[in-house]
């Protein structure tokens, strides 16, 4: 990886691989469904539990029907539809249908509270909602037209089947032309500052991301890949990295609406899943949960798993590889503000070869990356940790109706500031150290929670862990470990403290241990540190 010294002495890093072309004229649905004619009988989505399936023929037909119906109901270019659904077989059709009508897809978490969904609906200026009977109660009072999936007809709502049939009867309308520069998605992200914001993504953004991430897919893989659809489809990785990427490759998505280890393993075996994007807590489950031993793992056709969202502890990776020797583990890195995946392991030059263990991979084609000193903004050379910044055609247009936060995140040169600390080594592999906002400042030293968590997970009695900062009068902040201990373990707080102390520099020592029943995590697998910290502080006050 050659660093490019610019006139202003910036260290800018680019991909080892040549640039890939990005088509100019296509919308995202057109791009994703290119070449679909040969695959109309192939299953595009199947639900792991119910077996309900849709073919590529269904996807093409119903995407058109939905787009026509939404247009006839008054949806216009740039207007938002909020989708409140679990991972169902129709999800891809719904997203593509909204986009084909010129609308903007905004997925919401179906497990969210009514108040949280209301915030997203209001913040996005949504014109309608698509949901199912289970979630209808959450959205019926929001004052918008509601389309409900399923056979059941609900008074006051539009039935999905009826809507599609109405779409059949609609003639072709003179829609305003949809351009690549038009918005097509408005996912909500906490960004680098913690509060939920709408991320404005265009057709061009998402097509550019798919071109970069899929550059290594060989022609013989088209129509062959079976992907597990467990990561929520309302999440950027779910809709782009799973749904759109798999449809582009004419593979099959096995949709799971919730995580259950037995259902998960059954789905992998029964549907011959070859690629499973998952989160680190599931890796932990696969390594440590005795339920796994109930299954004949020799029946697995799984070739690779990809983890993102949180760093994978090196010892956990080793344990997983020992248990699943034929499954390749790829760690990836992405963010909503960059349209999904940004760095990844797959290497077309080496077949399924990957980057170094515990790196998040290499720079994808068409991307530029630099690392800056968070205090001075100065760009840094190889092997020097700094804030990861990325520049490409995948960078969002900004946060919806929030110029102040946009300006904090994207600078005048078009660099997206990720809020993550990392470095690039001599071979072009990138390593993420931690998030700026999660670094613990102990007596002026920066301590990365992820590093301490990785060490603690090597302890045989530790089943899960999270390290959080606690305020301290003398040190500023101290690292405190919230530990899920094996019920049969005899270790006390002091044993855990000594275990870490034997493995780190003095300033990185864990200063307090709290035994907890579980570690709260978001649906995407990220540790909810603030929740843990607040809980400890409230206990300490009593």
Curated annotation (Swiss-Prot):
It catalyses: (E)-4-coumarate + ATP + CoA = (E)-4-coumaroyl-CoA + AMP + diphosphate; (E)-4-coumarate + ATP + H(+) = (E)-4-coumaroyl-AMP + diphosphate; (E)-4-coumaroyl-AMP + CoA = (E)-4-coumaroyl-CoA + AMP + H(+). The keyword Nucleotide-binding applies. The keyword Ligase applies. SUPFAM superfamilies: Acetyl-CoA synthetase-like. CoA binds at residues 258, 443-444. Its main location: endoplasmic reticulum. Mostly confined to anther tapetal cells. InterPro entries: AMP-bd_C, AMP-bd_C_sf, AMP-dep_synth/lig_dom, ANL_N_sf. Residues 260-331 are annotated as: SBD1. Its EC number is 6.2.1.12. It is found in: Endoplasmic reticulum. Keywords: ATP-binding, Endoplasmic reticulum, Ligase, Magnesium, Nucleotide-binding. It is an enzyme of class 6 (ligase). GO terms for molecular function: ATP binding; long-chain fatty acid-CoA ligase activity; medium-chain fatty acid-CoA ligase activity. (E)-4-coumaroyl-AMP binds at residues 237, 309, 331-332, 336, 437, 441. Its cofactor is Mg(2+). Residues 332-399 are annotated as: SBD2. One of its GO terms (cellular component) is endoplasmic reticulum. ATP binds at residues 189-193, 197, 331-332, 336, 420, 435, 526. GO terms for biological process: fatty-acyl-CoA biosynthetic process; pollen development; sporopollenin biosynthetic process. Carboxylate--CoA ligase that may use 4-coumarate as substrate. Follows a two-step reaction mechanism, wherein the carboxylate substrate first undergoes adenylation by ATP, followed by a thioesterification in the presence of CoA to yield the final CoA thioester. Belongs to the ATP-dependent AMP-binding enzyme family. Both substrate-binding domains (SBD1 and SBD2) are involved in the substrate recognition, and are sufficient to confer the substrate specificity. Interacts with TKPR1, PKSA and PKSB. This is 4-coumarate--CoA ligase-like 1. It comes from Arabidopsis thaliana.
